[in-house]
Amino acid sequence: FSEISQFDRYIRPAVYTKLHDKVQEILNVTIEELTCIGHDFTDVANDFIRWCGDDYIFCTWGQTDLTELQRNFDYYNIEYNFPMPFLFYDVQKLYSICFQDSKERTTLKNAIEHLGMQELEGYHSAGSDARYTSQIMPELDFEKVRKFYSVDTYRIPQNIKEEIYLDFGNYGKYISRGFADREEAANDKEVTACRCFKCNKTMKRIIKWFSTNSKSYYGLFSCQEHGLIKGRFRIKSTDDKQYYAIRILKCTDEEGGKKIKMRQQREKEHRRAKRLGTPE
């Protein structure tokens, strides 16, 4: 990796015209300074889109930046043509795969300190955080993490043909189209399908999908070729109140299967106690 150019601009506040004292302390800038030196968001956004060009991929620290970017674009009616599905690299996740347990999420500052890098500027400003993130990327085993894209879901599939299927080797991810309500999403045939993410063959249901709340569902299946597969899907909502599912199917073993069974048993006991009005 090598730097080609930088894009770093201050935005003139238009919607929120006050800064909390803590935010001002972290950013080391006042609202008066932002008003004075900041630029109009629409101008900066269009310059940024032109700066990106046609051949790019976003690399962020965390998963929320691109959602907020598009939310602001829509608020200001700025035209943009990001790809669909919108794949990007969450460097925080890639760092965890390379240096942690793949599940933990550490701060940018902790990652920089762990790698023994110089801290020549502060944190929490867009420019400095982007520079620190770019310094971490060459330290990753990129051949190991290259396939682990993240998917931004600010925009979701609009129909069955656009639904997203990704295979990451030991697990597969599916993102559904939008539905009118949670129940419709949770009961959709494709959302609850039990086809192996590797061979696409129908699996045997060992534990049917069950919910632990109105958002999360779990299941356990067996593929004749690929063995035990555990499943989880969550129902989420978009800004315009569409409901969609993100489903993960992952290879597991007997121990992983036992954990799913234990989770199901705990949920049954919880519901039984709730019906009877007895303490758990």
Range-by-range predicted roles:
Residues I57-F73, T107-G169:
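Acidic, Mg2+-coordinating catalytic module of metal-dependent nucleases/exonucleases
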Residues V29, I78, M117, K201-M203, ...:
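Short aromatic/hydrophobic-glycine micro-motifs
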Residues F1-T67, I229-A273:
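Conserved non-catalytic scaffold segment of RNase H-like nuclease domains
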Residues V15-K18, Q24-L27, I31-L34, L94-A130:
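Active-site-proximal helix-loop-helix substrate-binding element of RNase H-like nuclease domains
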Residues R50, D74-I78:
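Short, surface-exposed basic-aromatic patches at helix termini and helix-loop junctions that form
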Residues N81-Y95:
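Conserved beta-strand -> loop -> alpha-helix junction used to position metal-binding or nucleic-acid-contacting
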Residues E139-E280:
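Acidic two-metal-ion nuclease catalytic site recognized across multiple nuclease folds
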Residues F1, E79-F82:
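Short, conserved catalytic or adaptor-binding loops enriched in Gly and charged residues
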